[in-house]
């Protein structure tokens, strides 16, 4: 968790989970925020027409884990147990490579927020601006990143049994959802994008809970200033 505890706590920690992930979120005042080790930064980005940007990961985390692990028994176990959490194309590829039957027809998509890993000597906000440009083709001139607060997220992936850490920042853009769609070019990280209307974030999904939590953090930080 680094030294984020030195920043003032804004909200009580909250834990959300589904069949794939378990996420613990803690909101802090921004203050001095520096990355002391490799981690990822994500942006909870709201459009000018009150929608939040959702990214469709090019390869699911599960597919990437099976494809790159050198442990053959692990490959087989993960495929047999969790292959319904992959796209049809991913299952077809691994079914062929592992000589295992494909027993599902569910076209699962990993929904994530724009962002990525911090590079050496890169600030947290610069990392997010770079990632949004790379993934969504949106320049920094269209972005306003909230620097009053941040959310630390500890993510446990139930499928691949691994932990990840992220810093989430709230971002507003003066582009509409249609303009973002028109700018978007599929890339090696993100194959597509979609949006959820701000009026629909009370639906009980993992990503809507993340959105609601950071909105609450932004409102709390504004009321404290």
Swiss-Prot record:
Enzyme Commission number(s) of this protein: 3.1.3.-
Entry keywords, A to Z: Hydrolase, Magnesium, Manganese, Metal-binding
InterPro entries for this protein: NUDIX_hydrolase-like_dom_sf, NUDIX_hydrolase_CS, NUDIX_hydrolase_dom, Vaccinia_D10_decapping
Cofactor(s) listed: Mg(2+); Mn(2+)
Matching PROSITE patterns: NUDIX, NUDIX_BOX
EC class of the enzyme, as a word: hydrolase
Domain Nudix hydrolase residue range list: 35-218
Domain of life: Viruses
Membrane-crossing residue ranges in chain numbering: none
Active site positions, chain numbering: 131
Binding site for Mg(2+): 122, 157
Molecular function GO terms recorded: hydrolase activity; metal ion binding
Induction: Expressed in the late phase of the viral replicative cycle.
Any one Pfam family match given in the protein's UniProt record, by short name: NUDIX
Binding site for Mn(2+): 135
Motif mapping: Nudix box: 116-137
Function of the molecule: Decapping enzyme required for the removal of the 5'-end m7GpppN cap tethered to viral and host mRNAs to allow their decay in cells. May therefore accelerate viral and cellular mRNA turnover to eliminate competing host mRNAs and allow stage-specific synthesis of viral proteins. Acceleration of the turnover of cellular transcripts may even promote the shutoff of host protein synthesis.
Family classification: Belongs to the Nudix hydrolase family.
Name listed for the protein in its UniProt record: mRNA-decapping protein D10
Organism: Fowlpox virus (strain NVSL)
């Amino acid at each position: 968790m680094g030294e984020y505890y030195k920043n003032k706590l804004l909200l009580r920690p909250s834990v959300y989970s589904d069949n794939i992930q378990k996420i613990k979120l803690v909101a802090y005042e921004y203050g001095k925020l520096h990355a002391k080790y490799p981690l990822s930064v994500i942006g909870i980005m709201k459009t000018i027409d009150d929608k939040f940007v959702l990214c469709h990961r090019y390869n699911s985390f599960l597919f990437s884990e099976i494809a790159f692990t050198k442990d053959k028994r692990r490959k087989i176990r993960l495929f047999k147990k969790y292959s319904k959490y992959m796209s049809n194309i991913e299952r077809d590829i691994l079914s062929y490579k592992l000589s295992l039957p494909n027993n599902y027809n569910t076209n699962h998509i990993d929904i994530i927020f724009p962002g990525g890993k911090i590079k050496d000597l890169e600030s947290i906000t610069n990392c997010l601006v770079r990632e949004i440009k790379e993934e969504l083709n949106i320049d920094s001139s269209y972005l306003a990143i909230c620097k009053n607060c941040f959310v630390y997220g500890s993510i446990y992936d139930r499928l691949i049994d691994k932990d990840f850490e992220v810093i989430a920042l709230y971002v507003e853009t003066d582009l509409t959802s249609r303009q973002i769609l028109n700018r978007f070019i599929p890339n090696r990280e993100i194959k597509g994008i979609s949006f959820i209307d701000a009026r629909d974030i009370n639906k009980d999904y993992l990503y809507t809970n993340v959105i609601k939590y950071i909105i609450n953090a932004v409102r709390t930080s504004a009321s404290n200033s």
